[in-house]
Amino acid sequence: ARALGMPVLGICRGAQFINVFQGGTLCQNVTPLRVHTRHRPLLLPLQTVRLVADSGLRRWMQASVVGANRIHSQAIRRLGRDLRVVALDNDGFVQAVEGRDGPWLLGVQWHPEYLLYHAGHRGIFRAFVEAALNFKRSRLEPGPEGDSPILSKE
């Protein structure tokens, strides 16, 4: 997907895969390392997450602090190349990463698909769909007669 310029959204394990794919590492069990946050999985948005000021995530969620859920015990340890941290929890664990440049790339450690009743979490999906539509449009070219678009073969 990255090589083709496709937008990528990684949720929970997907965010971890993005980091590992980019050469980063994971902490296998953060539960005993937590000091300021709950040690059990939470489906409700009871975890406080702070968003970086100049990030796409903050712009899409239209907030500086959000509530998030947590269903994982792993976290990013060493950040992968060409990624930047855009959200942290109260224990300082990475909760979201974005690509530094290139195609649209976002990985969130929580599950926004369970929180669609919050406008900010819907904003993540709105931004992803917009990026996907822009990608699709960029791959369209006029047909042989110049009237009907076809996908380019590149």
Feature-to-residue mapping (PLM):
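Catalytic nucleophile loop
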Residues: A1-T25
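Amide-donor transfer/coupling interface in amidating biosynthetic enzymes
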Residues: R2-L4, T31-E154
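Class I SAM-dependent methyltransferase SAM-binding "motif I" and its flanking Rossmann-like core
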Residues: Q28
